[in-house]
């Protein structure tokens, strides 16, 4: 089939964030049996470098100015959708559909669902949307956790998201999620009955062996630090770590675009990496991973990544969503004290550490095989 893959970020299995990695794997898989054209946004200097590895990709360059202009021009849309409402992108989108004789659009992230309106111009085209998370759920949590003017803003955005997401989902041919819980949420909130559940790709090839030495008594957090939910969780973990008062222990916050507040926490036993070339190697230096997330939505690929790399993971119920919500292999902890106790228990018991590590690897291999996604793609695109 002739497929047009559209995304808000550059798809690449070597991207520095989980969404980009997962999209890159989808493109690779789709290309095995189809003619795939990729159209994406390039959002920063890092992605400018990334796009050079893909001379066959079509793209539109964004800037802070273009984001502001688009947001102001489309006040009826939630900001995160409005910034992608680009005339340049839309014109190129239409041009490629015509030139490449596109039969199916494969869109990533809810914001790209707005381009489903292309079906008014091309009624025979199929439009499939991958919901990396259920956007309305994320905004519900922000409304609950905010106060004052921020609460008013979040509530207004929530209402716009609900209206926009409902409209997009009513028009698409198929919706894909990365876990059954998100599929159930779409059915509950929007009466979606055309949902397929994929397994996400989180960046691990289990055929590769690693010989990276662990730093004794080391803890890590992983995430794109420009995202507020990751920043808040990292700052929370630092507070917990400081209260543990273990001078021989090390904490590493791994991820690009850390805010100054986070950078200011750098000390003898707290390290803020910023961007790293090989995130897997950086994670593997550590003995455990901790994700004290308080909001966000969808499956947390960073949790799967750490888990699959053999690190025992301590996280909240939000971090466990779509992975192991009953805590069979994840260590679930909600309060700061519970998280601190879980860290102490793991780092003070080497046998338990090894046992949980092996269980995690086996769990990810069994439950999150990419083969399931390959099968679904073959069914959809034949």
Features from the language model and the residues they span:
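N-terminal subdomain of nucleotide-sugar transferases
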Residues: 1-57, 98-100, 242
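Acceptor-binding helix/loop patch of EC 2.4 sugar-transfer enzymes
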Residues: 66-79, 128-163
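Donor nucleotide-sugar binding/catalytic pocket of nucleotide-sugar-dependent glycosyltransferases
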Residues: 126, 155-158, 162, 166-208
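Conserved catalytic-core segment of nucleotide-activated headgroup transferases in glycan assembly
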Residues: 197-266, 272, 276-277, 284
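Acidic donor-binding loop of glycosyltransferase active sites
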Residues: 284-298, 309-311
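Short hydrophobic beta-strand element within catalytic cores of glycosyltransferases
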Residues: 302-305, 312-315
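Conserved acidic donor-binding segment of nucleotide-sugar-dependent glycosyltransferases
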Residues: 329-337, 345-350
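A charged, aromatic-enriched C-terminal amphipathic alpha-helix characteristic of glycosyltransferases
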Residues: 351-381
């Amino acid at each position: 089939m002739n497929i047009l893959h559209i995304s808000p970020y550059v798809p690449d299995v070597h991207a520095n964030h989980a969404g980009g990695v997962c999209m890159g794997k989808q493109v690779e898989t789709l290309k095995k049996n189809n003619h795939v054209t990729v159209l994406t946004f390039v959002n920063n200097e890092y992605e400018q470098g990334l796009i050079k590895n893909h001379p066959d990709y079509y793209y539109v360059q964004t800037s802070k100015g273009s984001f502001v202009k688009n947001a102001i021009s489309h006040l009826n849309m939630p900001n995160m959708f409005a910034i992608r409402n680009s005339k340049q992108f839309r014109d190129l989108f239409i041009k490629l559909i015509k030139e490449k004789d596109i039969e199916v659009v494969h869109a990533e992230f809810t914001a790209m669902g707005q381009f489903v309106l292309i079906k008014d111009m091309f009624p025979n085209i199929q439009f499939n949307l991958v919901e990396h998370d259920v956007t309305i759920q994320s905004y519900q949590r922000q409304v609950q956790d905010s106060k004052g003017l921020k609460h008013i803003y979040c509530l207004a955005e929530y209402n716009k998201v609900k209206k926009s997401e409902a409209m997009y989902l009513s028009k698409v041919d198929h919706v894909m999620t990365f876990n059954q819980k998100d599929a159930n949420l779409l059915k509950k909130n929007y009466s979606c009955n055309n949902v397929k559940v994929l397994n996400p790709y989180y960046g691990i090839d289990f055929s590769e062996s690693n010989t990276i030495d662990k730093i004794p008594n080391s803890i890590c957090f992983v995430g794109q630090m420009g995202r507020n939910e990751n920043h808040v969780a990292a700052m929370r973990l630092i507070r917990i770590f400081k209260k543990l008062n273990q001078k021989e222990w090390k904490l590493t916050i791994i991820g690009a675009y850390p805010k100054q507040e986070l950078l200011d926490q750098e000390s003898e036993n707290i390290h803020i990496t910023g961007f790293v070339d090989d995130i897997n190697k950086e994670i593997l230096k550590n003995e455990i991973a901790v994700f004290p997330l308080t909001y966000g939505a969808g499956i947390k690929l960073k949790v799967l990544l750490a888990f699959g790399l053999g690190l025992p993971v301590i996280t909240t119920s939000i971090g466990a969503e779509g992975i192991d919500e009953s805590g069979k292999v994840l260590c679930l902890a909600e309060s700061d004290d519970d998280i601190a106790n879980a860290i102490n228990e793991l780092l003070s018991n080497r046998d338990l550490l090894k046992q949980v590590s092996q269980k995690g690897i086996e769990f990810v291999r069994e439950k999150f095989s990419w083969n399931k996604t390959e099968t679904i793609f073959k069914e959809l695109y034949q």
